[in-house]
């Protein structure tokens, strides 16, 4: 499973803000550094602001900053915020939620349930702080 562009861009932007906590950061800067379409990123940032994940300051000296500590924002929080959690509840073989047919599961149901639970636990236990700690080891390029 991969993240939607919306979730991916949100995670990149949040990690970038966490690495630049001493100042307000403009959407244009994040978009340029990470080659993200500015209009798309602006919508993502607006939603993060509406939901209280980031602060937004308007004006020529404005920009964005984190509204929460990086260790208080999980990957799962962002997945849920953008409505992508359903992807992690879907059957691998059928176009429905696994739970909808629990009495007649598909052939990979039990293995998938186990793995799906591990994936969700990983996302719920991984924070923006974890992502920037990885960045400091040069494995997650959010500051370049």
From Swiss-Prot:
The keyword Nucleotide-binding does not apply. One of its GO terms (biological process) is regulation of DNA-templated transcription. The keyword DNA repair does not apply. PROSITE patterns: HTH_RRF2_1, HTH_RRF2_2. One of its GO terms (molecular function) is DNA-binding transcription factor activity. GO terms for cellular component: cytosol. Residues 2-133 form the HTH rrf2-type domain. Pfam families: Rrf2. Keywords: DNA-binding. It comes from the Bacteria. NCBIfam families: rrf2_super. This is Putative HTH-type transcriptional regulator aq_268. It comes from Aquifex aeolicus (strain VF5).
């Amino acid at each position: 499973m991969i993240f939607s562009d919306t979730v991916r861009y949100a995670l990149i932007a949040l990690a970038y803000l966490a690495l630049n906590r001493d100042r307000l950061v403009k959407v244009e800067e994040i978009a340029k550094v990470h080659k993200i379409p500015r209009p798309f990123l602006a919508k993502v940032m607006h939603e993060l602001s509406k939901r209280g994940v980031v602060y937004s300051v308007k004006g020529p000296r404005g920009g964005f900053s984190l509204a929460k500590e990086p260790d208080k924002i999980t990957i799962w929080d962002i997945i849920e915020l953008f409505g992508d959690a359903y992807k992690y509840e879907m059957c691998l073989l059928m176009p429905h939620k696994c739970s909808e047919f629990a009495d007649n599961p598909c052939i990979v149901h039990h293995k998938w349930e186990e793995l799906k639970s591990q994936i969700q636990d990983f996302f719920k236990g991984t924070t923006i702080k974890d992502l920037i700690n990885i960045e400091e080891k040069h494995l997650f390029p959010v500051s370049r």
